[in-house]
Amino acid sequence: MTLLPVVADAPTLPVSVVAVPAARMEHGFKTYGSGDTEVRALDDVTVAFAAGGFTAIMGPSGSGKSTLMHCLVGLDDITSGAVFIGEENVTEMNERQRTWLRRERIGFVFQSFNLIPTLTAIENIVLPERRAKKDVDHLWLDTVIAQVHLNDRLTHTPNELSGGQQQRVAVARALVSRPQIIFADEPTGNLDSKAGAEILRFLRRTVDEFGQTIVMVSHDPVAASYADRIVFLADGRIADEMQHPTPAAIPDHLKELDT
C-alpha cells in the first residue's frame, strides 16, 4: 500500500470507503446576496453518491448543477449544511486541507480539457503526481493508457491531438492518482458524437471494471444514459431521480422540470 505524505493540517482520510457514500451533502443551502437581491442557488439539498457508482446531474440552466459540484469539492462554501467526501467533513476544513483533499482524493474532468500546451500527452497525464512529488505507479499508468488507447500518442502535444484524444488525456490524468471520486463537468461538451461516445464508454468501464466513483454534470440525455442514476435539479432543489436511465426516458423528465 502506498503511504500518503504527512501534510500539516491535512485530515486523515480512508484509503477506501465502502460503508459510507463517496460524497454527500446534507441540508445544503447556498445563497448569494441578501434581502431583495438574495438568490438561493441551493435550497435544502440532501444527496448522496454511492462509492463505485456513476451518477449524472441534470437540470435546466441555472438549476444549481455547477454550484452543487463546486460545493461538493470545496471550491465554494455552502451557506449552511454539511458536505462530506467519504467520512471527512469538507465544511469544517480550512483551505489548505481542502487543497490537499482535492489533490489526493478527487479527480476532475472538464469540458475544456485543461491540458498544458507545451507538455506531451504523457507529461500532462502524470503532471499531478509530479507536482505532488509522488512516485508514479507505472503498472497502473500503463493500464490507464491502454484503456484510453493513447499508446501511440504519448509524445504528442495537445495541438497535435484531436479533441477526443485531448479529452482522453484529461481522463487518464484524472485516473492516474486513483482518486476516491471523479467529478466530470460536461466532459463531452466540446466533442463530436463519436468522440463523446468513446469518452463515455471509457468512463463507464472505469466504474464497471475498476470500481471508480463518478459524478458527472451533463445536459445531454445520451451522455447521462451511461450513468447508473440521474439526479435532477430545478431551482436549486432535488426535483427527481431516475435509476437505470435511457436516452428515450430522460427528455420526458427534463420537460417536467420546465413546467
What residues fall within each predicted segment?
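Conserved beta-strand-loop-alpha-helix hinge in the C-terminal portion
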Residues: 237-259
